[in-house]
UniProtKB/Swiss-Prot annotation:
Record entry for activity regulation: Allosterically activated by ADP and other diphosphonucleosides, and allosterically inhibited by phosphoenolpyruvate.
InterPro entries named in the record: ATP_PFK, ATP_PFK_prok-type, PFKA_ATP_prok, Phosphofructokinase_CS, Phosphofructokinase_dom, PKF_sf
UniProt name for this protein: ATP-dependent 6-phosphofructokinase
Similarity field: Belongs to the phosphofructokinase type A (PFKA) family. ATP-dependent PFK group I subfamily. Prokaryotic clade 'B1' sub-subfamily.
Superkingdom classification of source: Bacteria
The reaction(s) this protein catalyses: beta-D-fructose 6-phosphate + ATP = beta-D-fructose 1,6-bisphosphate + ADP + H(+)
Gene Ontology terms describing biological process: canonical glycolysis; fructose 1,6-bisphosphate metabolic process; fructose 6-phosphate metabolic process
Amino acids binding ATP: 11, 72-73, 102-105
Protein species of origin: Streptococcus equi subsp. zooepidemicus (strain MGCS10565)
Annotated positions binding Mg(2+): 103
EC number(s) on file: 2.7.1.11
Listed cofactors: Mg(2+)
Enzyme class: transferase
Positions annotated to bind ADP: 21-25, 154, 185-187, 212, 214-216
Length: 337
């Protein structure tokens, strides 16, 4: 394989630029040419394809977002869109593609592979909801951004004796809420993987203020459960009388310079994706397991998800065997500040 392309698709994630940089530099070192595709699959179909060299990826490792831009392109789910994209790739002499993104992006890569066009996936999403990897690119940065924000919210919460509901991203997976909540010492964490009793939530708030002598209460809520405003309304209807505020961290979690960890794993996975294409291997997704590079069928990575579930005892049972187990219940309460 002499010429490959790289694209980013779906929601952006800090560290995507580091992965693109690694793909380009590794490919050049292997004597391969690299082309960039702007705007993901939309740019592929439109022929928005151009050469990438070391100069184009210089100084990109510290930048958030993706300089190749990103877009959601549902038309690529249709055969017509897939064939149009492959036609453009062949027109530019491209023999394989590295796709950086989440589950929707993986489905596109899977379709390319089914048509006999080699594609390798790199997990780039802050939600950490891709199977076959312990961590996705952008997750660590998003968690650190959330923790920094929650720490600041605790300051103002303590000053006024308030309850704060902090809504974070995570439509189908509560990983950001779980990790950020534990790291910030949140008092309660509400995730899609666990059913909650709103009356118990209210009782815990009351106990903290009246019996434990606390002057704040922080609840981290994954957006996949419901909106922060809707959750606050349920709290009030269930009898919560605390001075309640809602903050939605929203898209701020997608921005910012990637952490050292995100830069490193993005670089590892980007280089490994090139190695797989050089060997003629398509239909695979790259991942990190126990700090080592792994690969798995892209079909499974796209379909299985990486969601965890919680037992009655509060233990996390991970559907993705490449993810760690945590004692959720113990950490959630014993580490709350």
């Amino acid at each position: 394989m002499k010429r490959i392309a790289v694209l980013t698709s779906g929601g952006d994630a800090p560290g995507m630029n580091a992965a693109i940089r690694a793909v380009v530099r590794k490919a050049i070192s292997e004597g391969m040419e690299v082309y960039g595709i702007n705007r993901g699959y939309a740019g592929m179909v439109d022929g928005d394809i151009f050469p990438l060299g070391s100069k184009e990826v210089g100084d990109k490792i510290s930048r958030g977002g993706t300089f190749l831009y990103s877009a959601r392109y549902p038309e690529f789910a249709q055969l017509e869109g897939q064939l149009a994209g492959i036609e453009q790739l062949k027109k530019h002499g491209i023999e394989g593609v590295v796709v950086i993104g989440g589950d929707g992006s993986y489905h596109g890569a899977m379709r390319l592979t089914e048509h006999g066009f080699p594609a390798v996936g790199i997990p780039g999403t802050i939600d950490n909801d891709i199977a076959g990897t312990d961590y996705t690119i952008g997750f660590d940065t998003a968690v650190n951004t959330a923790v920094e924000a929650i720490d600041k919210l605790r300051d103002t919460s303590s000053s006024h004796g308030r309850t704060f509901v902090v809504e974070v991203m995570g439509r189908n997976a509560g990983d950001i809420a779980l990790w950020a909540g534990i790291a910030s010492g949140a008092d309660q964490i509400i995730v899609p993987e666990e059913e909650f009793d709103i009356h118990k939530v209210v009782s815990t708030i009351k106990d903290d203020f009246e019996n434990r002598g606390k002057n704040h209460h922080i609840i981290v809520l994954a957006e996949g459960v419901m909106s922060g405003e809707a959750f606050a309304q349920q709290l009030k209807e269930a009898g919560d009388e605390s001075d309640l505020r809602v903050t939605n961290l929203g898209h701020i979690l997608r921005g910012g310079s990637p952490t050292a960890r995100d830069r490193v794993i993005a670089s590892w996975m980007g280089a490994h994706a090139v190695e797989l294409l050089k060997e003629g291997k398509g239909g695979l997704a790259v991942g990190i397991h126990n700090e080592e590079l792994v690969e798995s069928p892209i079909l499974g990575s796209a379909e299985d998800g990486a969601l965890f579930s919680l037992t009655d005892e509060g233990n996390i049972v991970v559907n993705n065997p490449h993810k760690a187990r945590l004692d959720y219940a113990a950490l959630n309460r014993s580490l709350a500040q």
